[in-house]
Amino acid sequence: MRQANLIMMSAAMLLAACGGTKDAGKTDQVLIEKSDIKIEGKRMTPEALWAMGRIGGFAVSPDGKKIAYTVAYYSVPENKSNREVFVMNADGSENQQITHTPYQENEVTWIKEGTKLAFLSNDNGSSQLYEMNPDGSGRKQLTNYDGDIEGYSISPDGKKLLFISQVKTKESTADKYPDLPKATGIIVTDLMYKHWDEWVTTAPHPFVADFDGNGISNIVDILNGEPYESPMKPWGGIEQLAWNTTSDKVAYTCRKKTGLEYAISTNSDIYVYDLNTQKTENITEENKGYDTNPQYSPDGKYIAWQSMERDGYEADLNRLFIMNLETGEKRFVSKAFESNVDAFVWRADAKMIYFTGVWHGESQIYALDLANDSVKAITSGMYDYEGVALFGDKLIAKRHSMSMGDEIYTVTLDGSTTQLTQENKQIYDQLEMGKVEGRWMKTTDGKQMLTWVIYPPQFDPNKKYPTLLFCEGGPQSPVSQFWSYRWNFQIMAANDYIIVAPNRRGLPGFGMEWNEQISGDYGGQCMKDYFTAIDEMAKEPYVDKDRLGCVGASFGGFSVYWLAGHHDKRFKAFIAHDGIFNMEMQYLETEEKWFANWDMGGAYWEKQNPVAQRTFANSPHLFVEKWDTPIPVSYTHLRAHETRGN
């Protein structure tokens, strides 16, 4: 096994170069621009991957004639990125970059009946709301708020601005002890003591302000005086808040808990704030799991949101609910789809909802008919769609696969697609990608498992190739047609490896029984599924059984550690990134206790709890004496600490 190449793959993000020039206006600012990289050998490299522009959000003009979107460019030497705005016609023609600044334009939307584009930018050091003409001229700052504006939504009548900004919710050590003004230490007296990558001293709050088109006034904190988050950390954004159609109510997502209660519960709710009365109503109080991402119907008669049933289970089925705003009747409308509802959007007449969801290793667009709650797939093929939105009588979405990053497409209701953007064509034209195919394999318990196999470019079945087993993280994250800028299968394949990526037990898109089997059974059937995948592929004459490797991150890192103690000399090399090594220490150290309690089944000291005892009996550290294969270890995880790699 070429160990140097294998290690390089896990660290591909560390090596690259993108173009950058000094901005003429401010000599200390570097303008990171589109790369003109030249690639030799037609193989994917870390440099090529980092040179790619990354398409972000998009917005369709009110008349349906224009599309605005953002693209981020990266510079490894500068250790940062820069996001710019593009505008194109509805058919993809006349695509123009309309900003050329180092100021991170993002969250672009159309305002003032499509005559202006609104966006966030940090021109003057903090993130504020700006506007410009659709050709990039007439740039104007609209807000001068004291803090950063992290997300925003302008009301349907155009007269109010809903925005997100951080509010201080906890005293620092220096606040508590004025005689120690330079103190930076953290005094921990309660959970959660941190959340992912930060010591939690602030919370995002939703604010509403009057907006006259030139600035804001009469700013109101919807959660004034409350220590809660809306949107919820660490990943929530403006999608967790929504205007009603008459611009006098805001629905927001919030988990109104603190301390230990916050650390053990996923019970968030949808609250509706009335701007006129300043009263708040909880419309999902009876549900005990996550309730998130509200959207009002275009006719104003309904509200839809995503809902998980069980408290503490962060990977529960993400169901779509709607509520009749007149009668209060609630309905679980996505029962016919036994997988998670991801992005969704109402049809203009409110009789249909379009959504994306993973099924059998692909994220497709579906139509949900609210007359009978039937679900029909619109798209097909080896792709993942995301970020679906209405586009006249069509849909618009981003699409990617294991062989291509995000581009923007239109989708007709019969499933035909048109690619609108060609952001990285100049790079793809220089590359030869490896073939991707799906194989169904019989597992040890007689079920069928979809496994993706990625071959090297110019694959020759008469040769023998080193082969990697890829172990997915999550643990309940799909092995769909994802495109990764970290664990990129085409970079691995470009170095003449075959990659085997099984949809082992514990992944969505194959029904609830398949998805839920992993909870409390980390060392069980999912590990047998891994062995099935690599053993089946090892039967192929072009797989070199003497050069098998195994790689993974997060739960995949745990899998690597566990397999290292049980692989019976199958593998010649491992790579573990961000994996749990000692389950007992993980239970004590991790801050999101709901995850540990549900997935591990309880605490390790609960001797009468058979699920917990099975979990901790399968901790990888208990099998170290059986390790006989090198394992490069790295950590940047925010829920499994670097101490797991010691």
For the regions a language model picked out, list residue spans one by one.
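Short loop/turn segments that connect beta-strands within beta-propeller blades
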Residues: 89-93, 133-137, 211-214, 274-278, ...
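Predominantly five- to eight-bladed beta-propeller fold
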Residues: 25-33, 83, 166-225, 253-269, ...
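Conserved beta-propeller blade repeats
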Residues: 52-67, 102-120, 139, 146-161, ...
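A short helix->beta-strand "capping" segment at the edge of beta-propeller domains
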Residues: 34-53, 219-225
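C-terminal motif of bacterial Sec signal peptides marking the signal peptidase cleavage site
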Residues: 16-17
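Cap/lid segment of the alpha/beta-hydrolase catalytic domain
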Residues: 423-540, 544-546, 553
